[in-house]
Amino acid sequence: MEYTDNPRKILGRVDVIYSDTEISKDIQTTESGNSAISHPDEVFGAYLVPTVKGCTMDGNATMDGSFQMMDDSVVLGWWSGSLSGSSGVFANAPWIEISFVKRPIISWVVLGDEKRNEYPVDFILQYKRDGKIVHSDSVTVNNQIQVRLTPQLEDITSIRLTITKWSKPNACAKILKFYDRMMERYEGDAIEMFEVSEEMGAADGNYNIVSDTMTVNIFNKDRKFDKGYLRSLMILDRKLLPSIGIETDGEVKYQPLGTFYSDEWQINQDSQWVKCSAVDRLMRLQKKTYVGFPLTENASLYDIAADILLNIGETADTFVISNDLKSVIVPMAFLPKGTAWDALQEIANAGLCKVFVNREDKINVRSEKEPKTTTAIRIDKSNMFSYSSSVSLTEFANRISVEYCDVSLSDDTVEAVSVELNIEPNASLELTLDYNTEVAYPAMETDNLNVLLTDFQGGVNACSVVAKNKTAQKQKAVLMVTGKAIEITTKSLTMQDDDSVRNNGVTEYSHPSSDLVQSHAQAEYIARILLERMHAGEGVITTTWRGNPKLNLGEKYESEDRFGDSQELVCEYNKFTFDGGLKQETRGRTI
């Protein structure tokens, strides 16, 4: 069965992850002891296999070439400080305890070292509620690397693992994982409906950053959300993963629709349904501070975008940036301190980019030049409920104005900020200082040689630094940041469609300014693209149809109206509504 079939059987489901290593920032561990190299915080990570087969000097490693030396860069989990005896029994049983906010424990995992084939043989798990043991699980004669226990407990705040016997003699305990996420899947009668909206650009056609949303109504079985085991987890940032599926030859193939984080829970005692509203992770960027991009000559928009994302904790595998932005060079690039959201909006304005999160939960910075995949999806009167075409005032213009700037530096060094500190004996202060003026190439100095300045990161309007008192006496110090003053001269370029102006009069659009547009060529490119897009008659087509979740943002599809006229569109917006069946609203822009 395909999504184009009629009739068809559509299924929907929503996985809600109430606790995992990403969204649970409160997790802590305590241990009886640690080996010289030990990473107890890794036991609640997502690791299933150590980085290396660690070489040890306890007689349990050989020179066969399979063992490797270790350092703190490897993933290995918790290695205890005590060794087992000749029979594997510990004279002093090592333990590790993990604590967290109150949560139910449906299942729990204990994972040893797969590469070394080592694991706990005899061990005890103690489940605690506010420090008091409420349940224990004792395991003996275990011979498995991984053990999953299912205690089914409520309101647990910590769990202790005590190991009395190990699988190898004269060896420390090696626990890679001591954690399990809390996840429930809702499908069938457990879901009344859900709605997912994904968008790569606003309807007005501006280049900007857009956050996706979803809502779901879940059956409050046995009142578990307000009176049962989930009541303590009705908090923000729980992870939701909606999917749409279709049954083919007795097998359901699901299409994930993204990852969202709970923004609001509505639990009405007069209703059997709980409503959850959620947003994608882009919304978090409004609360994340980006220290800024220091003035750098000939930096590309690609490098600046990557710097923003890496500095707020993203990694190279959690975002995608259009490669053509590497060729957009900014002669004197800089960004001031601000939110990561605002910084990415600057990239969008300067490079004509859409910033959004795709269904793989990756942040996309996609330029207008990004190649668009063609699909076989077609919307016509056979699968369409409604069709509308719109060209708003914000989507039509025949004269485009784009600002660009020249950036230069003063010859003189100026003071950006000066601050007086009192630092306690042997203490360190982590400081973030806002400047009084924007400067390039900032440098910091102090009038007190007993104060050590480290980890200085200087931007154009703010900096961060660690100031350490090297003495046993209280110290007073003045910190001063100096640099070259930044001077900006703004220019404007105007481009128009002469024929349209003669026929229709002038309708002008001014593109949002950005200090990252610093060349006439880039301003001309922006104006030309905008003029092409804002021709009369080139608006957006919005259709409501039977739907196919295989249509992704940025992909091309064919749309035919009720009069038989067809055109190729680029998908910029989808809204999926599942209530036992599927309905989809799609907005596409003419190419």
Q: Language-model features: where?
A:
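Solvent-exposed, polar/charged alpha-helical surfaces in well-ordered, non-transmembrane soluble domains
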Residues: M283, D303-D307, W341-N349
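Short beta-strand/loop turn elements enriched in aromatics
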Residues: A190-T215, E314, V402, N503-A536
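N-terminal export/assembly leaders
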Residues: A305-L335
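C-terminal, non-catalytic macromolecule-binding modules
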Residues: K474-T507
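Assembly/oligomerization scaffold segments
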Residues: M1-L295, M332-F334, E346-L352, T413-T482, ...
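Soluble non-cytosolic domains of exported or imported proteins
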Residues: L295-D303, F334-D342
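Loop/turn positions that initiate beta-strands
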Residues: D237, N552-G554
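Extended amphipathic alpha-helical segments with heptad-repeat/coiled-coil character used for oligomerization
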Residues: N349-T374
